[in-house]
Amino acid sequence: MQRTAGTEVTAMLKQGIDSSAWQGNIDWDQVKNCIEAIIIRAGYGKNNIDQKWVPNVEAVRDSSLDVGAYWFSYAYTADMAYMEGCYAANAVKNKFGDRQIPIAFDLEYDSVAYAAKKGVKIGRAEATLFAIRFLTAVKEFGYRPMLYTNIDYIRNYFDLGVIRAAIPDLLLWVACWGSEPKDYNMAVWQYSSKGSVAGIIGNVDMDEVYVDMEIRDGVAVPAPAPVQENGRKQMRVTAKTWLNIREKPDVNSEDLGDLPAGTVITVDKIENGWAHFEGYCSAQWLKQ
């Protein structure tokens, strides 16, 4: 799937990137002409601030870009994850004050490998708990909770049902390069790690942002939230290719098949982001 920043977008879609010190010196005057949203790494581990956090933030803070932050985790206990959330929130507070931007918890393969070197095996229970503790700290500081993850980690590490029960206003940021995930009610989709944007030398991660990440003047387009709508209705599949059908309202339940784009189905209930008909599918990709 070939995409470039700066293409035509809808009112509910913003083209964005995420950046860190790995991108080196960025020409933000050029970049800001190509994108509408940016998620910047604030730091990692035990209060290590990203080397480009300050210049990157100062270049975009007062622009029209929709801004978020993320923190790469090296936590191997729940207390460490909570403290990382505090470190991240403090970094954001120092630069954004009380502006309500999201802060994402980023636990990946290197995080798990680091924990293993410390004699700790991070499994589904641990990863889920760490995410909740980090995001709890973020919320305590008044910032929006976001989880960065990929399909493998959703299936094998993060229990999204448990996390969403603990963090109902969770923003989900899903990395799935080359194919669009359908089941996860995501706020941001990272669709490539090899994007090209004027003003950045080398590759950069590319994102599609479906919500207003920052709450400005008390108003934001919310992330998909738990709702219940009863009553049968005809709805059309708006996904670009197909939409998975699940046996239960859970991304880890049995895959019963798929609905091609444009298919019209009769939905009898929408609850917690899932539409029920003969099976279940993500309500995010249905429209009356």
Residue map of PLM features:
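Functionally critical loop-and-helix segments that line ligand-binding/catalytic clefts
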Residues: 3-23, 28-29, 161-227
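Substrate-binding cleft of extracellular glycoside hydrolase catalytic domains
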Residues: 9-135, 139-141
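Hydrophobic anchor at the start of a short beta-strand
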Residues: 67, 144-146, 172
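Aromatic-lined carbohydrate-recognition surfaces of secreted/lumenal glycan-active proteins
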Residues: 138-156
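A short beta-strand micro-motif
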Residues: 233-239
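Short alpha-helix capping/helix-loop boundary micro-motifs
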Residues: 249-254
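SH3/SH3-like beta-barrel superfamily modules
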Residues: 255-288
